[in-house]
Amino acid sequence: MREIVHIQGGQCGNQIGAKFWEVVSDEHGVDPTGTYHGDSDLQLERINVYFNEATGGRYVPRAILMDLEPGTMDSVRSGPYGQIFRPDNFVFGQTGAGNNWAKGHYTEGAELIDSVLDVVRKEAESCDCLQGFQVCHSLGGGTGSGMGTLLISKIREEYPDRMMLTFSVVPSPKVSDTVVEPYNATLSVHQLVENADECMVLDNEALYDICFRTLKLTTPTFGDLNHLISAVMSGITCCLRFPGQLNADLRKLAVNLIPFPRLHFFMVGFTPLTSRGSQQYRALTVPELTQQMWDAKNMMCAADPRHGRYLTASALFRGRMSTKEVDEQMLNVQNKNSSYFVEWIPNNVKSSVCDIPPKGLKMSATFIGNSTAIQEMFKRVSEQFTAMFRRKAFLHWYTGEGMDEMEFTEAESNMNDLVSEYQQYQDASAEEEGEFEGEEEEA
């Protein structure tokens, strides 16, 4: 019941995805060969959300791995859980997208997309009641962003009523891998606004900060960063996979988090984050989890929630705890910091409690917030985009693949509209119904 098909694209997506499958397999007691070695029936009860049972009792992830070059997939295949995936579900080209969104979306990616869709169909058909798709990708490169958004729009056509959840790694403010990141990211956001239901926004810099500040790692690797992301990914779907007192699924999340269809870009966080040495000295309480959960330093994308207001938020707790205490703490947060929540959506924090904590912890919490502060991130990318686009820098790489300049202009204005929508709702108050007309001009 309620299966989720997982798709990972490009180098970033495949590396995050590989880490995620290590975490989920571990939670369900599945070893790298796909054999169950768990100790509790609860691990098996809804294992089919993410796994397919194959012959001989082997569990195979409902995962589709795609890339336009074979490199990253080879390293996934030779990694710790590389042998658990279905070999047919590796779909790759040989050319690479070369960090070019147009190659991923229009030329190289378009040639490969049909073979990916065949695998998607095959996975969807083996589901009893498909809940939706989750896509891991980055927005700065070529494959994850260009081909990832192409795949999302194709799946949207074929499965219009299923949830589409993305984990999108956006370019960081200070750390840049590629000069053309602002182009790729803007073109991708243009697609995600229209075709995705929920986007969890992540970025490397915020993740590095968490590793430095909170986890006290002196030299964080991408492995450490991806571990943080996979903790959130596992937290978001734990209600589907384990019994709980207050359940949440992808659709409930969407209904509670998205007040307006375009505003579906969320900040995420996870607690407890403690440095490796100090774990055993801390007994966690619900107030402590709540405290860390709402902490701005805990957000995995480079936007400061204190610069905006929360439209809605969702807290997913895991472990044995009293639901009464959870509710009290959530109310407490809203009452004490009421200026950071919009007053025209009363009680805008949803909470859910799942009984089974993640490996090695007594309790944990995952946070998803829909805050107007996320406009900072879009603004930043948009400014970098405009600076380059005004001079038409690097544009020939895109037009050479058949793109038109108009597409860039459209993507740019769509992104700017998104920013002003967030701004409009940040400034709106509950009383001023008739004043909206004047407000929009100012935004």
From Swiss-Prot:
Residue numbers binding Mg(2+): 69
Subcellular location: Cytoplasm, Cytoskeleton
Stretch list, region Disordered: 424-443
Chain intervals with Acidic residues compositional bias: 429-443
Tree of life domain: Eukaryota
Binding, GTP: 11, 69, 138, 142-144, 204, 226
Xref: InterPro entries: Beta-tubulin_BS, Beta_tubulin, Tub_FtsZ_C, Tubulin, Tubulin/FtsZ-like_C, Tubulin/FtsZ_2-layer-sand-dom, Tubulin/FtsZ_GTPase_sf, Tubulin_C
Cofactor section: Mg(2+)
UniProtKB keywords: Cytoplasm, Cytoskeleton, GTP-binding, Magnesium, Metal-binding, Microtubule, Nucleotide-binding
Gene Ontology cellular component annotations, sorted alphabetically: cytoplasm; microtubule
A biological process term (GO) from this entry: microtubule-based process
Biological function: Tubulin is the major constituent of microtubules, a cylinder consisting of laterally associated linear protofilaments composed of alpha- and beta-tubulin heterodimers. Microtubules grow by the addition of GTP-tubulin dimers to the microtubule end, where a stabilizing cap forms. Below the cap, tubulin dimers are in GDP-bound state, owing to GTPase activity of alpha-tubulin.
Subunit: Dimer of alpha and beta chains. A typical microtubule is a hollow water-filled tube with an outer diameter of 25 nm and an inner diameter of 15 nM. Alpha-beta heterodimers associate head-to-tail to form protofilaments running lengthwise along the microtubule wall with the beta-tubulin subunit facing the microtubule plus end conferring a structural polarity. Microtubules usually have 13 protofilaments but different protofilament numbers can be found in some organisms and specialized cells.
Name of the protein this chain belongs to: Tubulin beta chain
Source organism of this protein record: Chlamydomonas incerta
Gene that produces this protein: TUBB
